[in-house]
């Protein structure tokens, strides 16, 4: 049998249409850019194509899991054919210092669970110092965080870039004090 270009094009077109409607779609990942409306509305919309292909598998409550192991239950809000991360979303965003301009990569892991990787405005993955912290998520929306490192280092709730900026300011202050001491010694000698 001879396969012509037209036959090959039709076969490709048909298989492409079938894969878009396949309930076992390989589409498991999506990304979202945090917009001002995301922060203002305190909810984030799941992309329409992901909803079309995977939305029927999602329960009313999903779990977001970060690489550090932080888990948060988020209640979904359905508006027509749209699905939004809603109740619990603003707490998740606050706990991870998510701001406008951040980039989030979601990977669906079955059983209404998503792995979330957060990229900050520097376009680099944000690493949270939670590996020494024990997080207990309960039904009453209270999260208990324990651990020596967390208690001493992170009570101020500063973002990593604020901590780095504070270190730089401290170093500048120390250099200024040393410079003034040197000038005082010169004045006394001279």
From Swiss-Prot:
Compositional bias segments (type: Polar residues): 12-23
Q: Where in the cell is it found?
A: Nucleus
Does Nucleus appear among the keywords? yes
One GO molecular-function annotation for this sequence? DNA binding
Q: Which UniProt keywords apply?
A: DNA-binding, Nucleus, Transcription, Transcription regulation
The main location class comes to nucleus
A Pfam family the protein falls into: B3
Its organism's taxonomic lineage begins at: Eukaryota, Viridiplantae, Streptophyta, Embryophyta, Tracheophyta
Q: Please indicate which superkingdom the organism of origin belongs to.
A: Eukaryota
Annotated Gene Ontology cellular components are: nucleus
Entries under SMART domains matching the protein: B3
Q: Which residues bind DNA?
A: 29-122
- Where do the record's region annotations for Disordered lie? 1-25
| Protein name stated in the entry | B3 domain-containing protein At4g01580
């Amino acid at each position: 049998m001879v396969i012509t270009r037209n036959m090959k094009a039709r076969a490709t077109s048909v298989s492409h249409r079938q894969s878009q409607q396949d309930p076992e779609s390989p589409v498991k990942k999506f990304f979202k850019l945090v917009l001002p409306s995301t922060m203002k509305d305190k909810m984030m919309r799941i992309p329409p194509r992901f909803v079309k292909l995977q939305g029927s598998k999602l329960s009313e409550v999903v779990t977001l899991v970060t690489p550090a192991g932080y888990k948060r239950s988020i209640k979904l809000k359905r508006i027509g054919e749209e699905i939004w991360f809603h109740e619990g979303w603003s707490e998740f965003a606050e706990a991870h210092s998510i701001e406008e301009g951040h980039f989030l990569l979601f990977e669906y892991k079955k059983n209404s669970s998503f792995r979330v990787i957060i990229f900050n405005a520097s376009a680099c993955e944000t690493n949270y110092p939670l590996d020494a912290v024990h997080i207990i998520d309960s039904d009453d929306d209270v999260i208990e965080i324990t651990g020596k490192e967390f208690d001493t280092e992170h009570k101020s709730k500063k973002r990593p870039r604020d901590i780095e900026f504070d270190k730089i300011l401290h170093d500048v202050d120390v250099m200024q004090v040393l410079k003034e001491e040197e000038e005082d010694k010169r004045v006394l000698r001279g």
